[in-house]
């Protein structure tokens, strides 16, 4: 495992409120090729950070969308998926999701419904792309995967091994994330913002009157004396 060189501040998700930052999460069973897809897309220009404390791998990427420079963080599960559930912070402030299954392992396709249900619990509105990975057999692309059709989700046939459709997949995911951020306010974002505002109000109310008044300066007798 790579050394964890990440400072705590680098996991501050407040940065995703900035206009030029987006967060894209990857979901799916173990060994479906999520990490391999990201590495294929980023090629040699990536330095994945293993955040062992948070059980995730963070991939940073800079993209250009409509002439704007966008800083993209791709979040990978780094083993959490073996528990068939992710921590709520993994979904927090995500702007798009890439959900992957292995066309050669039917169980990974069946488990998409579990991942999608959890995604919508935390992020009801963000765009989600379904990815059929490991299409070594071209006949696979002729199969009908009804899950994507059922939920009106885009379906991409890709191969991490030879790169088929990988660049298009990630570029489209970035564009969807940017578009979502510009044009929509997720219900869960509103809830989190309300909770943050409430916490700040509570902190202000808890400050003792003596502490609040301690910053008010009163003139000393020496300063008030006309003979000083």
Swiss-Prot record:
Q: List the disulfide bonds.
A: none
The cellular location(s) given in this protein's UniProt record come to:
Cytoplasm, Cytoskeleton, Microtubule organizing center, Centrosome, Centriole; Cytoplasm, Cytoskeleton, Cilium basal body; Cytoplasm
Q: Which GO terms describe its biological process?
A: cilium assembly; intracellular protein transport; intraciliary transport
What PROSITE patterns does this protein's entry cite? RAB (PS51419)
Q: Does the keyword Chaperone apply?
A: no
Question: Where expressed (tissue)?
Answer: Expressed in the testis.
The GO terms describing molecular function are: GTP binding; GTPase activity
| Top-level division of the source organism's lineage | Eukaryota
Residue positions annotated to bind GTP are: 28-35, 76-80, 133-136
* Annotated segments matching region Disordered: 200-228
The residue range of the signal peptide is none
Cellular-component GO terms for this entry: centriole; ciliary basal body; cytoplasm; endomembrane system; pericentriolar material
Assembly description: Interacts (in its GTP-bound form) with CEP19 (via residues 121-150); this interaction is required for its localization to the mother centriole and cilium basal body. Interacts (in its GTP-bound form) with the intraflagellar transport (IFT) complex B (via the IFT74-IFT81 heterodimer). Binding to CEP19 and the IFT74-IFT81 heterodimer is mutually exclusive.
Belongs to which family? Belongs to the small GTPase superfamily. Rab family.
Role according to the record: Small GTPase required for ciliation. Activated in a guanine nucleotide exchange factor (GEF)-independent manner via its intrinsic GDP for GTP nucleotide exchange ability. Involved in ciliary assembly by binding the intraflagellar transport (IFT) complex B from the large pool pre-docked at the base of the cilium and thus triggers its entry into the cilia.
The name of this protein is: Rab-like protein 2B
Which organism does this sequence originate in? Homo sapiens
The gene designation is: RABL2B
